């Protein structure tokens, strides 16, 4: 059975009327994006007084890639239109704010963190926006760099319209509060936030975060995960792993009083404002600064835009620290409700595809199984799990700890960015950072673990070497965890990984068929259940597995899984959901390999690929 890693690695309200003022034109620069292959920057010129300038629209359009299916819709969701005029006027207004530490202050639909006003710099008269450059089109946001007449730079983050308005608002509020907490409470190097807006009803005209610009190089430049073993490789890998492990160690230093996500005091409903997020705060300025509210973990918003918000609000917490099982159950509940809602929508469509109905019914069955087994998965009082009580305490979890989200300044200064989806949950219910996580078969020594390794052909050696390097990198992460937090190292147990796998797989749904991996992880537990009950690892005293599978069901599941994996490894761009980097898309289209179909989608002409195989590189 292919793991996810192997599967993926094988493929690539009304607005206040704007005040009128005289401002200078702004040069809008479309800069090269991270991971892009464009050869030249393109500059777009527009006047602030002409908001209808057609040139300006190009600056907001998504250009990083194209999709084989629903390309126009996907790009429309990723347009990041905002008011340049409104932003300019708003920046000058912030200049008059007090710099005292207080709750974010409301201003024309936005919220301002006055203590960070120094990010604007000093101006004799007005704060003027000199230029805007698009520097990155990411998976969830577009990033703009703002240059002011004070010589200061800021970052404007505009989220794509991929989730409901309520979800986008909650994520922005929580991320800003999390950044504030990391900076003021833990003293960590993260961007300071100047202002944020949680909806379109502000002078920027869009949800946004306006924060400190951090210059430097991405730590990812130093990450070479498949380098052969050597003293130099070991040192290089540690230069990336160590600062991220140290950052996580500081995150784990605070134990919270609830499970959920961080918000500012005034951003949660009244019933939650009386509960302290953690105990022992001695700084009067921080005592009532943050609170714990509903979780913004991605599973409560991703692909949930058609689920009624009142239902989501019932399931996304916060939860009492004494009841981690309720947090786990909420994931099974929301996926089950989402699948049932999708089926209801399909049944209401007279022309619905029967294959779609069949797929949704299979999803429902899987999530019913998940709902049944979730409260039994882990014994929260198990004497067989070292420091089990510590493992279940509420701690802050950042889902995107990654060298791609670390900016280095000099040798030892590392700034961490991107805290969307941060949540407070038990450490035992988290996974390793994706850049070191490995779910495949472990190989600790190539020659000892692989009989006849030296006699294998080069291709087979490369495949086993890949597995070895992935194992090595994960082990290095575990060694660092053990060094910093030996009391939490039980998460490295293979048995703990198996037991919590159904829950984690449900948090990692990317395609409509990924429910198969959830079911597969439940099936895997069946053979081990009796031993886990005997050792009090699971929350059950019944050695009989709680889910009854028929041979027919298991055979069908295995066939569906094999078909899904075959499609994934054999279909170009299946792993990316049909998304293709724009330069590659243009080249393949020019070559006739990508062709447009009658319904406006695109397809790959396999025969064309065979007719035009890649040419060998010419030697100088």
From Swiss-Prot:
<keyword id="KW-0496">Mitochondrion</keyword>
<dbReference type="InterPro" id="IPR011009">
    <property type="entry name" value="Kinase-like_dom_sf"/>
</dbReference>
<keyword id="KW-0809">Transit peptide</keyword>
<comment type="similarity">
    <text>Belongs to the AIM9 family.</text>
</comment>
<dbReference type="GO" id="GO:0005739">
    <property type="term" value="C:mitochondrion"/>
</dbReference>
<dbReference type="InterPro" id="IPR051035">
    <property type="entry name" value="Mito_inheritance_9"/>
</dbReference>
<feature type="transit peptide" description="Mitochondrion">
    <location>
        <begin position="1"/>
        <end position="35"/>
    </location>
</feature>
<protein>
    <recommendedName>
        <fullName>Altered inheritance of mitochondria protein 9, mitochondrial</fullName>
    </recommendedName>
</protein>
């Amino acid at each position: 059975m292919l793991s996810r890693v192997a599967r993926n690695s094988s493929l690539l309200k009304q607005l206040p009327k704007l005040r009128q003022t005289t401002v200078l034109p702004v040069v809008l620069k479309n800069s090269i994006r991270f991971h892009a292959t464009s050869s030249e920057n393109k500059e777009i010129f527009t006047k602030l007084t002409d908001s209808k300038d057609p040139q300006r629209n190009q600056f907001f359009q998504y250009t990083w890639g194209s999709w084989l299916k629903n390309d126009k819709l996907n790009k429309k969701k990723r347009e990041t239109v905002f008011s340049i005029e409104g932003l300019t006027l708003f920046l000058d207004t912030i200049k008059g704010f007090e710099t005292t530490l207080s709750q974010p202050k409301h201003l024309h639909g936005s919220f301002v963190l006055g203590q960070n006003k120094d990010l604007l710099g000093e101006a004799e008269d007005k704060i003027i926006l000199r230029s805007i450059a698009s520097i990155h089109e990411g998976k969830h946001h577009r990033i703009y760099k703002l240059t002011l007449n004070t010589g200061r730079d800021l970052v404007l983050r505009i989220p794509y319209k991929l989730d409901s308005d309520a979800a986008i608002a909650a994520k922005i509020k929580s991320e800003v509060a999390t950044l504030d907490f990391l900076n003021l409470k833990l003293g960590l190097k993260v961007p300071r936030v100047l202002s944020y807006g949680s909806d379109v009803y502000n002078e920027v005209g869009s949800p946004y975060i306006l924060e400190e610009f951090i210059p430097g190089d991405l730590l990812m430049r130093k990450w070479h995960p498949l380098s052969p073993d050597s003293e130099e490789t070991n040192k290089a890998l540690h230069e990336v792993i160590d600062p991220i492990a140290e950052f996580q160690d500081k995150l784990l230093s605070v134990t919270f009083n609830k499970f959920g996500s961080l918000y500012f005091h005034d951003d949660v409903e009244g019933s939650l404002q009386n509960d302290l997020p953690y105990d022992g705060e001695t700084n009067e300025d921080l005592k009532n600064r943050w609170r714990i509210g509903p979780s913004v973990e991605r599973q409560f918003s991703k692909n949930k835009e058609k689920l009624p918000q009142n239902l989501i609000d019932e399931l996304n917490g916060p939860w009492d620290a004494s009841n981690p099982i309720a947090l786990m159950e909420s994931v099974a509940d929301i996926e089950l409700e989402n699948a049932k809602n999708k089926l209801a929508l399909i049944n209401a469509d007279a022309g619905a595809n029967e294959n779609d109905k069949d797929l949704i019914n299979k999803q429902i069955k899987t999530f019913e199984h998940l709902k049944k087994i979730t409260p039994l998965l882990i014994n929260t009082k198990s004497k067989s799990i070292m420091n089990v009580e510590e493992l279940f305490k509420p701690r802050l979890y950042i889902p995107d700890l990654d060298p791609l989200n670390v900016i280095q300044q000099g040798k030892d200064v590392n700034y961490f960015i991107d805290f969307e989806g941060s949540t407070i949950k038990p450490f035992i219910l988290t996974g390793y950072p994706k850049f070191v996580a490995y779910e495949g078969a472990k190989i600790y020594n190539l020659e000892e673990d692989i009989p006849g390794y030296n006699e294998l052909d080069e291709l087979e050696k490369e495949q086993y070497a890949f597995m070895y390097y992935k194992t090595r990198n994960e082990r290095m992460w575990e060694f660092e965890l053990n060094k910093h937090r030996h009391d939490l190292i039980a998460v490295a147990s293979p048995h703990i990984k198996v037991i919590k796998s159904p829950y984690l797989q449900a948090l990692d749904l990317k395609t409509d068929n990924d429910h198969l991996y959830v079911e597969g992880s439940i099936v895997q537990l069946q053979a081990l259940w009796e031993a886990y009950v005997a050792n009090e690892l699971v929350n059950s005293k019944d050695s009989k597995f709680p889910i009854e599978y028929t041979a027919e069901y298991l055979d069908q599941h295995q066939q569906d899984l094999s078909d899904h994996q075959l499609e994934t490894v054999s279909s170009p761009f299946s792993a990316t959901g049909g998304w293709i980097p724009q330069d590659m898309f243009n080249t393949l289209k020019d070559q006739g390999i990508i062709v447009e179909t009658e319904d406006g989608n695109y397809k790959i002409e396999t025969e064309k690929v065979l007719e035009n195989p890649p040419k060998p590189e010419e030697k100088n």
